[in-house]
Every structure is written in C-alpha cells, then in structure tokens.
Amino acid sequence: MTNEQISKLETAILNMEEKKSRIYFLVQDTKGNAKASVRYIYQIAKTLKDNGYNSIILHEKPDYFGVSSWLGEEYMELEHQPIEGTNLEISPDDLIVVPELYGFVMDQITKLPCGKIVLSQCYDHIFETLQPGQTWSNLGFLKCITTSEKQKEYLEGAMRNVSFDIITPYISDSFEKSQLPPKTIVNIHTKEHRDTINIIKHFYAKFPQYRWITFRDLRGLPETQFADAMKESFVSLWIDQQSSYGTFPLESMKMGIPVIGLVPDLVPSWMNENNGIWINNKTMFTDVLSDFIQNWLEDNLNPNLFESMDDTVKTLPTKEIFENEVVELFTKMFNVRKENFVIQLDKFQTIEE
C-alpha cells in the first residue's frame, strides 16, 4: 500500500512540475447572451492556458451553447467538458474552480481528492444554493478568489476558515473614447430588466419634452457590439445593487462617458463623489437624468467630472497586470500544494525504509 501511495505522490508532484495538472473551471451556460461573470472566468482560464497550464472549461450539459458568438472563437479553443454523462478524470494534484452560485455542486464534489476553490463575483449568491448551516469550508473549499477588496471583507465575515485572494477584472481595449461627437443616446444597463423599462417609461411620461432622447439597452450584447453601441452615447445609467466591482460604469468612464448610477450595497473602492453622479434612490433617476441633459445641452457639465473619470481609469489594472496576477496566484497555489505533497512523500519514504 505504501509503495502505491509513494507512486501516486511522485506522479502528482511531476504533474505539477510539468503543468499537466488539470484546472477545471465550472461555467454557466448563458445560451449565447453576454455575461461579464462568465467572461471573467474564461479570461482566467485562457490566461492560464496561454501560459502552459492545463485549464479546462466545465459545463453542466453536453448541449452547451458556447461563447463564440459574444466572446470570440479563441475562447472556444479551450478544452470543454460536460459534467452530465461523463466521468471526469480527477487526480489529487488537480484543481476545480466553482462559482459561488453552485453550492449544490460543491456539495456533490466535496469528497473529490483535489484542490477546491470558490470563485465569488457576487456576494448575493453565496448562500443561495447552500443548505442552512453549510459553509464553504464544511464542503472542503478552503480557498476563494474574488474580484474586489470590498467583497473580500464581506466574505471574510461570512465564510470562516477560508483564505481569500483577489484577481481584479480588467477593462478591455475595446472600450476607447470616440473621435466623433456623441449622439442623443442614453446607455442603460440594469441587472433587472424591469428597472430599464420603468426608468424609460417614467422618464418619457414625466419629461415629454425629451421624447427625442433615445435609450439604448446594452444587456446581452457581444463585447465589440457593446463597445461600439456605447461610444455613441452622451451618458450611461447603471443599476446593480448587488455588484461587487462595477464593470459597466468603468467601461463607460474609459470611453469618456459620464455615469448616473445607483450606489451598490458594497460600495466599490474606485467610486467617489467626483467620478460620477451617484444616487441612493432609484426613484431619483429620471429627475437627475433630466438635469444632466439640460446641463449637457447648455455645455455646462463640470469639467472636474471628466478629469476624475480619467484619474479613475488610470488606476485600473491593464490586461497585462490581470494576466500576471492570474499566473502568479495559480503558480503559488501549485507550489504550496507541491510542497505539501513532498512532505507527505518524505514521510512515506521514511516509513518504507
């Protein structure tokens, strides 16, 4: 038995040294709709693949729609495997990364002999599919990757005995300032579609003099179409109270477009009183938008707003920084696991002698 254990440990150590260990990433099937949380996972997986690691995308069913229509064909070149109807190969040196929404999957794989990591992008989902009293550490998930310091602070209070690391999302170079004057278009991006409908109807009812203003709902568009559509506008509206990072307003700022947004429950560290028009009551949206339009038409917007937006964008990680953070974190994880395996191997070899 000891010889068998020694052989398994030696194989696991060699796999990690040669980057053969599998890194599984579970993703949601968005049925062709663009979703920032899924894009983030694919970006991490592709970065690892491009740096020699063996990253694999896991999806629930064999008829997975894929992401080529909105994210790009290069992301579908990653290896994909369905959970349903297949026996996954899992070795002790492998890692599996599961979004916080999949508590039921964590429960199912709790006994798998591999490293288990939670990827948490929305604090509002962490208890949604867990049983009462369950925690990540109960299920063998002792590490978590999240997107911001604010979310990390919240999670540390909710999930004990778990270590947390941050990989900050980056804003794609698709989002750049337009060289053309903006059109009379308002970008609107809300988590709940009913908020979009309510704001538009309320605005037109209360301010019929602005019927010539066009609202553009950007939800679900592929990234390039999203960016092309966004750059034509003169202001963006944003509602996502459960947001832990705020990708949309940052994309808007990078394009030089002011944001009127509802302050989320976890206020992101980049948000300040100067880089946007932030409100705490969504019933105020129409009035605030009307005032903004009037100031815009009169060329009376505060120039400090645009300076603060640019200053905020300068603090954001680039794609290169994001990729370095990803590679450094997973290299560190494998190094720690390899050290633990070497310690176990030394013990078994001592017993064998």
Locate predicted features.
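A short, glycine/small-residue-rich beta-strand->loop->alpha-helix junction that serves as a flexible
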Residues: 28-40
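Conserved catalytic-core segment of nucleotide-activated headgroup transferases in glycan assembly
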Residues: 37-40, 44, 153-226
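Short alpha-helical segment that forms part of, or immediately flanks, the ligand-binding pocket
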Residues: 227, 250-254, 268-269
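Short hydrophobic beta-strand element within catalytic cores of glycosyltransferases
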Residues: 258-261
